[in-house]
Swiss-Prot record:
Family to which this protein belongs: Belongs to the scytalone dehydratase family.
Name used for this protein in its record: Scytalone dehydratase-like protein claB
Binding site for substrate: Y48
Keyword list, A-Z: Lyase
One of the record's GO molecular function terms: scytalone dehydratase activity
Amino acid sequence: MTRQAVPKPAYEDLVDCQSAMFEWAESFDSKDWDRLSACLAPTLFLDYSDIMGKKWDALPVEEFIGMASSPHFLGNARIKTQHFIGASKWTQPDEGQIVGFHQMRVAHQKYGDDELKQVLYHGHAHGKATTYYRNVGGQWKFAGLVPDVRWTEFDCDKIFEH
């Protein structure tokens, strides 16, 4: 059986995409929306069918940041997360785009008080994520995400209830 060659990105481009992915995850978890804005492409492809039942082909960056920073989502100061990225593989379907495939575990904790002492719920999502990167003005930017949640633990479904 022969395998068809899958185009792979150059090492320097891959490192730049890993950096954009790190900035995306860290800005989500630290709720640093300016930092998030700096690593994103002008529009994003998002398929959140698994987690929100929604999909966007070209969501403007401002709308994405507004959604992410909403008090009903990650902008809620009583919700803490960690987006942990495991093993990855990468392809480059064309000169201006790179696609990453990553093992993911996302830990969530929701508190009942502003001092973050009373834990109401905790839940973890396990699966993989397909991420997209676009070369914008010579710099690789995070340009899309398709989470694939395989299973969850604890009260993951209650974290974003309001």
